[in-house]
Amino acid sequence: MAVKFIDGSSKLFIVREYATMRDGQTLVKISDREGKCIWVSADCLEVLEG
């Protein structure tokens, strides 16, 4: 699944995995084209078609 940040950035990321925390927040592990991965809050991402 492809996603991008909701701040208007055009850079695309691929979702690798996700986790729901005890407080209900969802974290998503995303990677860029170089394969670098980071965990971010799902609230700051927009899902793209695909």
Which residue stretches match the model-derived regions?
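Basic/aromatic-rich interaction segments and small domains that mediate binding to polyanionic partners
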Residues: 2-44
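Short hydrophobic/aromatic patches at helix-to-coil boundaries
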Residues: 46-50
